[in-house]
């Protein structure tokens, strides 16, 4: 049975609109200095081995050498730091293709669409769920993409230690070019190069996760915020593609059936939006619907000046471990 968490309340709100502005991203290198957190004017606890990354080969701590240009473990496994500031910790055996993750076109389309503010409602709703996290809490975005939601969180809570991973190298590179402090790595959400019990809160926005792997890296009673599509999500777009639309079923089944997590609460966010001009094509290309649309449907959508659609998100809050009755 879902319970409310007093210090981390999920408000029930359907159709609510949020008006506070989100930061517009700047294409600059992240100011994060791995692995030390660099935000100012906040008291810091010492950085321990659990606050960094572990070697994906042997599981020992990665430490900087060569003026921080390379990270190496005691067994001499080494990983070069990209010029943008991120690490690539994705091993070949954890890849299913040469370039895993979303295509470059999908990622850049999503970046343009999100930067235009169409999902501002969702970003604000996520931010509403984290005020109880204490300074220096470590928040992980699993499938962070090009960093839109992490940057929004940093704007609201610059006292948190932010960590973002994505299996797409292109996405992580774009995230690293945003001007906000975060530990960023190319990594698999199913084989996280993070220490056990090292994360206070994890979020996942439309990204697949491994319940057991997230439970491993979360601290006891740590929190997981999962975002999935509501039944009417993008119904205005799918009406142009399918004759018979099937409501979204969400992506929570594995978590709801997991012994590792307890559901604490959930909320639906629903809003009607009007998408303009080239953003319509970006929306189509950033979703799997692009591959379901015929060439004629893609062309027809590309000619639209305006698209009216619902955006509908289901946000669920889980706690790591069972909750006493």
Could you tell me what each predicted segment is?
Residues 180-192:
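Conserved SAM-binding strand-loop segment of SAM-dependent methyltransferases
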Residues 166-170:
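Conserved SAM/SAH-binding beta-strand->alpha-helix loop
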Residues 50, 269-325:
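Conserved Class I S-adenosyl-L-methionine
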Residues 30-99:
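N-terminal auxiliary segments of SAM/dcSAM-dependent transferases
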Residues 146-158:
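Conserved SAM-binding loop of SAM-dependent methyltransferases across substrates and taxa
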Residues 222-232:
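Conserved beta-strand signature within the Rossmann-like core of class I S-adenosyl-L-methionine
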Residues 96, 101-121:
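Class I SAM-dependent methyltransferase Rossmann-like catalytic core
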Residues 136-145:
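Conserved class I S-adenosyl-L-methionine
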């Amino acid at each position: 049975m879902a319970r409310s968490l007093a210090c981390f309340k999920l408000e029930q709100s359907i159709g609510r609109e949020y008006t506070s502005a989100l930061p517009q991203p700047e294409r600059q290198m992240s100011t994060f200095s791995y692995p030390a957190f660099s935000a100012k004017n906040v008291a810091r606890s010492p950085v321990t081995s659990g606050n960094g990354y572990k070697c994906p080969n042997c599981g020992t701590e990665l430490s900087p050498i060569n003026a921080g240009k390379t990270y190496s473990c005691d067994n001499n496994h080494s990983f070069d730091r990209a010029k943008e500031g991120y690490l690539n910790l994705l091993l070949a055996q954890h890849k299913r293709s040469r370039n895993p993750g979303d295509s470059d076109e999908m990622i850049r389309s999503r970046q343009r669409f999100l930067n235009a503010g169409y999902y501002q409602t969702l970003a604000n709703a996520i931010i509403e769920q984290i005020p109880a996290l204490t300074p220096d809490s470590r928040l992980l975005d699993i499938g962070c993409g090009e960093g839109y939601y992490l940057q929004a969180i940093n704007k609201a809570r610059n006292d948190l230690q932010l960590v973002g991973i994505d299996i797409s190298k292109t996405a992580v590179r774009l995230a690293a070019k945003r001007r906000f402090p975060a530990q960023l790595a190319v990594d698999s959400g199913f084989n996280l190069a993070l220490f056990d019990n090292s994360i206070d809160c994890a979020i996942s926005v439309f990204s697949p996760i491994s319940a057991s792997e997230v439970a491993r890296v979360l601290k006891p009673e740590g929190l997981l915020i999962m975002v999935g599509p509501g039944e009417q999500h993008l119904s205005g777009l799918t009406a142009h593609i399918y004759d018979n639309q099937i409501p979204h079923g969400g992506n929570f089944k594995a978590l709801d059936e997991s012994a590792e997590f307890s559901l604490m609460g959930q909320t639906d966010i629903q809003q009607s939006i009007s998408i303009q001009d080239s953003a319509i094509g970006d929306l189509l290309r950033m979703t799997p619907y692009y591959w379901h649309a015929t060439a004629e449907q893609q062309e027809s959508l590309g000619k639209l000046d305006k698209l009216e659609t619902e955006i509908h998100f289901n946000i669920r809050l889980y706690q790591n471990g069972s909750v006493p009755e």
